[in-house]
Amino acid sequence: NIFIHDGARPCVTDNIINACMRDVMQYKACVAAVPVKDTIKVVDTDGIAVNTPDRSTLWQIQTPQVFEYGLIMEAYDRLYADNDKSGITDDAMVSERYMHTKVKMTLSEYTNIKATTPEDILVTQIFLSQNTKVSM
């Protein structure tokens, strides 16, 4: 198995990693994720809401994203051979598109945030300073 993790997520915990290891053994592909708490709107090019998806079906994807080694390697081989790589935003999408993989959502933690904006970095610093079970 291979774990793909985003270095901008320093608050990943042992519990998240262990849950992903458990799920990849059963499902061959899994991603750390949490249920969406906010209402999400689909908008048009003018910023006008055109649809409100059912929140109960939406998950916020994190890392690690974990795959059987051969599965993700074959998926990436197919990606590199394809002329149309548009719309790929994460490793799970590569596996879904090129291997038709059913990716398991592994329940993660809301503290496993991606620190990409100044606000994210402040929140991450708070989580890391709390002396919680955050792994580095």
Residue ranges and their predicted role:
Residues 33-34, 53, 109:
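Residues at the C-termini of beta-strands that transition into short coil/loop
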Residues 1-2, 52-56, 105:
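Short, flexible turn/loop "capping" segments at secondary-structure junctions
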Residues 42-67:
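Short, flexible, basic/aromatic active-site loop/helix in glycosyltransferases
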Residues 25, 41-45, 77-80, 129:
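A generic structural signal for secondary-structure junctions
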